[in-house]
């Protein structure tokens, strides 16, 4: 199934390759969930954990898991509009319920450029994204989330909490020296992640941009080089194929 939202760095182009590389496991833990392309594309594992540090993102999936019909009911009569987008964007989160926060977030992500939630998405060759306004569109997502633990913790806490010999961690951290991610993730965080993955009992697969610094950090692990075509730009010269690495300890 498709992921219900779009996010910066989403794995729609790579998920088939990633899923084919997932080893045998009992517990599946996705540390940087984002849009969840791999999770929504693979067969369910016996135990599954999805996690992201983005509080609003995780609130959305929690609310879909428990209150999907109410989210659909409130979105049914909405439409794609710059005015509505700006109105949602300027809401004070402190005055909203968890359900209303999830509706706001879903609207902003689905109607924004590149799913960043900051700029209203428009075009002359594509239509607005209407799928969130349809009834029962969240049913499949709700069912997929039914037996999944949904966490909103730092990556280090997730690794500490769920690391077992039978655990597989899928890691898709913010890319090195790449702008556009909502949360700060610099060299300190990348090195901490590397150090923790070096010492886990389970297995991991990490996706990241192909950079000499990254190759140095993960020297000694297994590398698979891939080329991915990205088009998240209004400028044609910013589009094209980019090198990425799939790094594993197995």
Give residue spans per PLM region:
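SAM-dependent nucleic-acid methyltransferase catalytic core
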Residues: 1-13, 21, 65-170, 174-180, ...
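Conserved proline-anchored active-site loop of SAM-dependent methyltransferases
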Residues: 18, 28-42, 50-54, 109-113, ...
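SAM cofactor-binding core of SAM-dependent methyltransferases
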Residues: 20, 24-92
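Short, polar loop motifs at secondary-structure junctions
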Residues: 33-37, 136-138, 208-212
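Short loop/helix-cap segments at secondary-structure boundaries that form the rim of catalytic
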Residues: 39-44, 160-164, 213-220
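Short, acidic/turn-prone active-site loops that include or flank metal/cofactor-
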Residues: 53-56, 175-176, 227-233
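Long, positively charged, glycine-interspersed low-complexity recognition regions
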Residues: 186-250
